[in-house]
Amino acid sequence: MLAKLVQLPRDLLELVYPAVCLICAKSPTSPRTHLLCEKCLEAMAAQPMPSSTVLAETSPPTSLDAVHAGWPFDDAMQALIHAFKYRRRPSLSRILGALLAQRLYKHLAREIQQAILVPVPLHRRRGRERGFNQSQLLAQTLAEAWKMKILPRALERTRFTQQQATLTAAERQKNVEGAFASTEKSNLPNQTIFLVDDVFTTGATMNACAAALKTAGATQVIGIVLARA
């Protein structure tokens, strides 16, 4: 899929994309991505995946049944996700989403045949500030790669919440409790949902989203994330 990324004129690329890799900040970027160097791309592909976690039988029980992550949340992934979200590099969704699709396919091949993709939503205010929803962009790339149905607005944030990164585990859970609601009740009963986000830390956000999806009738909610902290 990386080979299918749109090729832009070189002079325009030099204006839009960095001359050096977003991870190492040293090597020239690869012509395949224009954002990462070949060495860092190869390192990402070779890195072991975090073990998939089944959450349905944990204590206390969670609404999220399992979570699958492409990478650990190390320095390299932190740099990429920071650039993606805060340095406004939405084009990273195509690269990271394609790599994630390749890494997770064999672990989810059976579920992919029947599941529906749903991104974790941003509040309208934060969406205006950022200009895009990183989870929705990732979900769209996964939908193309896996030929899956996506419901980009199946969930909404019912209230503005503080950014989770600044909070403790207990504060994160309280911050997002009851903050999500389903807008697609007719399409969710008896469905398996792939819930897409960028990072899984304590799971508070994804669990709150999963609770809303199950209230709307979903039978299984599986988290799909770039990285797990």
Predicted regions and their residues:
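Glycine-rich phosphate/pyrophosphate-handling loop used in enzymes and phosphotransfer proteins
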Residues: M1-A229
